[in-house]
Amino acid sequence: GGAWSDRLIRVAATGSNDSGVSWIVETDGRRIFHAGDLNNWYARFLTDDYRGGLVYSAEFGIDVNPEKEEKRFLGELKDIRKITDSFSVVMFPVDGRIGYTRGARQFIDTFQVGLLVPMHFVASGFESAWRMKEFTDAKNIPFWCISSEGDSIEY
């Protein structure tokens, strides 16, 4: 991806396994990661009874191979790790449509994270994002979730 900077901020586009890009923003000595649509999108199909091969995704109207898609996602994390292994703040999708926490858990297993902020969960309800808190607590990672649109935090 490309990058842009001035004397106050540096913004770099990094990969995604979906349309668009993810972002690394550096400012005031902090490194912020915005995942965009980067996630383990088909994690919900990786259940105990999954036998491999293609699975039909009714949401997207296509056949997908969840194992192959997970490898693509993990490959993107590997590429980002070539740039850095830590972030002050991470904004990452945690959504019931995609298996809730698997992608975010894989992210915090790969990187040092100062604060995790879930996103993309409004369609599945604000409470769905709280499923991630037990995993951030286990790693002593601060967790902040909005309770309504317009909420903000100073960190």
Set out the residue ranges of the language-model regions.
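Core dinuclear metal-dependent hydrolase active-site scaffold
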Residues: G1-D85, S148-Y155
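Binuclear metal-ion centers of metallo-dependent hydrolases, dominated by the metallo-beta-lactamase
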Residues: G1-S5, T101-Y155
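Small-side-chain structural scaffolding
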Residues: A13-S16, G20-S22, V90, A104, ...
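Short beta->alpha connector loops
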Residues: G15-S19, D95-G99, V122-A123
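Generic alpha-helical hydrophobic packing signal
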Residues: T27, V90, P142-W144
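Structural motif
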Residues: G36, P93-G96
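A short, acidic, amphipathic alpha-helical segment used as a generic capping/interface helix at domain edges
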Residues: G75-I80, R97-Q106
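Conserved acidic residues
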Residues: S88-M91, G114
